[in-house]
């Protein structure tokens, strides 16, 4: 059971603080009694109680004080109320002077800031953080503020009744800095974040597409052009032959083409020839790619067939050896064929040894 979570859970009135009086309990049913107070030390009539089997009997006298991230906070006896807010790790809590033994809390509590209360119960630093933001699920559903103000008792949420559960910690600095924002302002900020994220994604996608297109065009230009930037002489000769043949035909279309070619500037002719060269090179690359793929498929099929044949040869050799062993095993039988085979094999072995 986290000691500070009890305070955060009861902090539903905004800037009002809460203090803990001396707790009472038995061996198996411990509980804390909490009295609320406003600025000026005016106590509310209602009394709150938080029950849990993991809560020990602690005497929470005096204000909890200490710098940020300090783990030990002494307790004074002149004040019966303590308000806990802030970003600190509370590892243990000390009892009053009449009980000098140190009492360890089950878990470490992470808060946002530490503020002290004077004898009148007025906060000197930062007001308490609202529990609806820091610990919204501390109490069970269905509980209201009027229910607490009427002096009724409320049991903690089941998830906080187990000592092994970690306390509810706000890990984002953005949430700690904007705890006073309303729900509408938070939704507005979330919408702005979504819109900005969508705009950034669209911009990144547009930039990637433009870079891809430019890189594709540049790669084609590099592949089509020679190191000196000259076009292919064969394509140029082919284009010249085409123009000459069209001129020999003497058709009106050929005359128009001849007139257009005469009106072209050297740069325009160069672009046209380079475009034809790119088209021819692209077709050549496609044919080469198809030929390579077909060759790879043929080689793969041949390799598979060779592997299968090698396996078959090894199996046949094993079968021949097995048959020879069977013949040797039946050499004492009255079979003329077996005897002739064994004698021929023996003569072959003897002749091989002589040579």
UniProtKB/Swiss-Prot annotation:
Q: What SMART domains would the database entry show?
A: BRLZ
Q: Which UniProt keywords apply?
A: DNA-binding, Nucleus, Transcription, Transcription regulation
Mention one GO biological process in which this protein takes part, according to its record.
regulation of transcription by RNA polymerase II
Which cellular component appears as one GO term in the record? nucleus
Query: SUPFAM superfamilies given for it?
Result: Leucine zipper domain (SSF57959)
**Origin, by domain of life?**
Eukaryota
Task: Indicate whether Ion transport appears among the record's keywords.
Answer: no
Major place of residence: nucleus
The residues covered by the bZIP domain are 267-330
- In residue numbers, the region (Basic motif) covers 269-307
Q: Region (Leucine-zipper) spans which residues?
A: 309-323
Enumerate composition-biased segments (Polar residues).
218-265
> Mind telling me which Gene3D superfamilies this protein's record contains?
1.20.5.170
- Region described as Disordered: 218-271
Which molecular function terms from Gene Ontology are attached? Answer: DNA-binding transcription factor activity, RNA polymerase II-specific; RNA polymerase II cis-regulatory region sequence-specific DNA binding
Q: Does the keyword Zinc-finger apply?
A: no
Annotated signal sequence range: none
Return the similarity comment: Belongs to the bZIP family.
PANTHER family cross-referenced by the UniProt entry: CYCLIC-AMP RESPONSE ELEMENT BINDING PROTEIN
Q: What is this protein called?
A: Transcription factor atf21
Q: Which organism is it from?
A: Schizosaccharomyces pombe (strain 972 / ATCC 24843) (Fission yeast)
* Name of the gene encoding the protein in the UniProt record: atf21
